[in-house]
Each structure stands twice: as C-alpha cells, then as structure tokens.
Amino acid sequence: MTWAQQRRFAGHWFPEVELVPTDGLVETLRQTKDEGEIARMTAAAAMADAALAAVRHRLGESPTEAEIALELEWQMRRLGADGPSFQTIVASGPNAAMPHHRAGGRRITEGDPVVIDFGAQLEGYRSDMTRTVVVGEPTETLARMYDVVLAAQQAGVEAVRAGVAVAAVDEACRSVIREAGWEEAFLHSTGHGIGLDVHEAPRVSASADATLADGHVVTVEPGVYLPEHGGVRIEDTVVVTSDGCRTLTRAPKDRDL
C-alpha cells in the first residue's frame, strides 16, 4: 500500500486510531529470523548449491555468460525454487573486474576467471552465494588473488558471532586484503543482511554501527578486482549464533574447473 492510499483509507478503517509513521521499526524486526524463515533460506541455499553443481562443468565448453545464467536459473526452478533471488551475475575475463556486471554475450574462454553470484528464492526468502572458478591455468597474479580472497572470506566467517560488531567482521576480511597490498581493489562492503529482500539490515561494513545477534542472517563476500587480471569474489550466507555461525551456502570453493 502506498502512503497516499493509507492516508485516503485510514479514516475509514480506523476512525478512532491515530496511525503514527515509524522509521526503521519493521526493518529492525526483520533482522532476526525465526526457525521457519531460516528453514526456507536453508532450502533455498541447498537449491543454489545443487544448481551450481549441475552447471559448473559447462564453464569449460565455451558457453556465453548469459547461457550459464539461464542454466543456473532453470536448474533452480527444476529443483523447486520460485525463481532466482536477483538477476544472476556471471562475469568472465575482464568483466570479472566489475562487481555488478550482468551476464552478457561474452564467451567464456581458456584462462578466464568466472565470477558467479546468484541465489534461489523460495516462498519469499532468498539465498545469496558467489563462487569464482578459473577455466584453465590461472596466471600467477590471478592465483594469488584467489588465495587472498579465500583467506579473507574465511577470516570474515570466523569473526561472525552474536555480540560482534559488523565493523569487526568487515575488518577481519579487509585486513587480509590490506596485508596483500590490494585494499584499494576491494571495492565494496563485506556483506549485508538477507531474507525477504536480498539486501536488508544489518549492513556489514566499516561504517555501519550495528552488532550481530542470534538469528541474524548475513553474507560475507570480500573481493579483489584488478582490470588487467579480472576479479575474484567468494561469498557465503551464514546464520549468526551465540558461538559463531552456521553456513547455509555450501558449494565447494575449488578455484579450478
């Protein structure tokens, strides 16, 4: 319902009640997921895992980015998903250096890094996962990029725990990339909440003033992007617990095809 509709009908529906606008109340309530919500997101993540397993081998057959995106979405629907969480990202070669590239007509070729960022939607709830695969032999720089991003992502996941500031999770990832000399090539925040929307509170970044709590569901997705080499991003969706977190997205993080 729009604000104009609410104003038009409020007097008829609730003549004795004053409706007071709120700012952030619903968004705050939505941060903590109950068991039913987490169950849907767990199932959605499993569908995305299975879809990637079914399609991954196709990367070596010189498909276009758009063909891989279409096949992933078809596989998720075949497995019972209502559809993709968002427009599937398949970014190959130089396109991998653009964090939000959309799948296009470029053919995936030998030596390409391929960044695949996608998820399944089930009964309104979403998953989000990124894997990077190298087709053929990586260059020395690309291999190092992968190792650094994987280490950063693992450090970020290990930092997730109820009571931890989101900025501390961001720093856990960012410090690994900073030590490698690529801090300026980490072009975005470390993650975000996810649920009914693919991006919701809490935002996992250096500037965010929020603390993780039991039942929050967030992503951890560091990346390094170098135009002359492509890009690497690795992402998981995790459920925050009192003693750490539980990873929902479980597809292997193997670099090589």
Predicted ranges, named:
Residues M1-L257:
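Active-site neighborhoods and metal-handling regions in enzymes and metal-associated proteins
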